[in-house]
């Protein structure tokens, strides 16, 4: 088995074929490019041959004279010639159209013979294409066509487009998950969509313009860390709010007791102390106290303390 590469095409466009008993077997594939090259070579050879065999001006002039004025032995001369004999100068230059006419006729005849030969061999070429079964092909190399950085950028854009399409097709599910997380109707789940929506919801509550598409650049580990941080922050904040409400209730009771004892200057102290001031001044201490006392995130206790805080501000207990 002999493999012969045909490399008359471009660098990456390489075709190979293998046949038994090559080169004795002449029935191999000829591509359209090879056929055009053969035709061009044949025309060039014809032009060179015609330029080499063109007769001299004297020979063309004598041939033209023989055609125009035949000999005396010619029957046409005996019957038709009525003009007197004239002297013809041999060194007269021949007409240019005569030489071009001869060259064009020879070229047309050779091209006709070549076309006939090609048409006769066309069936054999088509049969050889169906008979050859061991012809491997090779596609152009992608490394030459595309740049590495450009291919990476195209892949990244394709991934972003696919994620956007997936988010568009699942918009209703995303809205349901967002509603459940926002109103707390279901506990947090460790799914990718819930984590991402929880992060976006927290960012929007704090006035940060963040969308789900902005989180596409984050890896799964980063999403998990952000989600855990937000969850821990909410839990610690709930514990801190419980301690803060207890402090506000105690301050209101002390204010009423001092007013009862006649300290009018203490009036309005409870209105000056708010949750924000407590959070700024002793927020970390409240968090530490809640952790030491083991106060958990109890929604019931938080609601009770909130209601009690409102009533203590309005009602005089002492």
From Swiss-Prot:
Similarity comment: Belongs to the orthopoxvirus OPG137 family.
GO cellular component: host cell cytoplasm
Coiled-coil stretches noted in the UniProt entry, renumbered to this chain: 145-172
Compartmental location: Host cytoplasm
Induction conditions: Expressed in the late phase of the viral replicative cycle.
Function field: Required for viral crescent formation early during virus morphogenesis.
Reported modifications of this chain: Phosphorylated by a OPG054-independent mechanism.
Name of the encoding gene: OPG137
InterPro entries in the cross-refs: Poxvirus_A11
Keyword Magnesium on entry: no
A matching Pfam family: Pox_A11
Keywords: Coiled coil, Host cytoplasm, Late protein, Phosphoprotein
Main location group: host cell
Record-given protein name: Protein OPG137
Subunit-structure text: Homomultimer. Interacts with OPG160.
